Design a protein with these regions (language model features):
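Chalcogenol-based redox active-site neighborhoods
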Residues: 1-143
């Protein structure tokens, strides 16, 4: 598997807005409504990625820990179901329910949101503080 380097939005960049369906309950979620009072962690991830699979329990725990600090977590999958059918909304919902995600899992069918964030691989993490300015962009760990 090839390592794909992430692109870096400049720190301080305003978070792009988005409005995407939550696969868990089919509700449209907008960043303005779901962001946390102290910040928002946006994770680009997908079901089939071995790095996501490896980190998933840690991601779930981080989301719970962050919520206690007023930081919302949002996961977004932008993979094409033509090339990765296991990353489609039905499979995303199964995973979210099985793992009891405490955060919305959104589907970016057009991949427009991923492009706006310059997300190039999974998982990609973007931490925005409360004014929606990029504070931190990095991989979860060295794995």
């Amino acid at each position: 598997m090839a390592l794909i380097e992430s692109y870096m939005l400049p720190l301080g960049t305003q978070s792009p807005s988005f409005s995407l369906p939550n696969v868990i309950n089919n509700q449209i979620k907008e960043l303005e409504i779901i962001r946390g009072k102290n910040g928002t962690l946006i994770i680009f991830m997908c079901n089939h990625c071995p790095y996501v699979i490896h980190l998933l329990e840690g991601i779930i725990k981080t989301a719970i820990d962050f919520s206690k600090k007023g930081i919302a977590t949002v996961a977004i999958s932008s993979n094409s179901i033509k090339t990765h059918p296991q990353d489609g909304p039905k499979e995303m919902k199964k995973l979210a329910l099985l793992k009891r995600f405490s955060f919305p899992y959104l589907y970016d069918k057009s991949q427009e949101v991923a492009k706006n964030f310059q997300a190039a691989c999974t998982p990609d993490f973007y931490l925005f503080y409360n004014q929606r300015k990029l504070y931190y962009k990095v991989r979860y760990d060295d794995s």
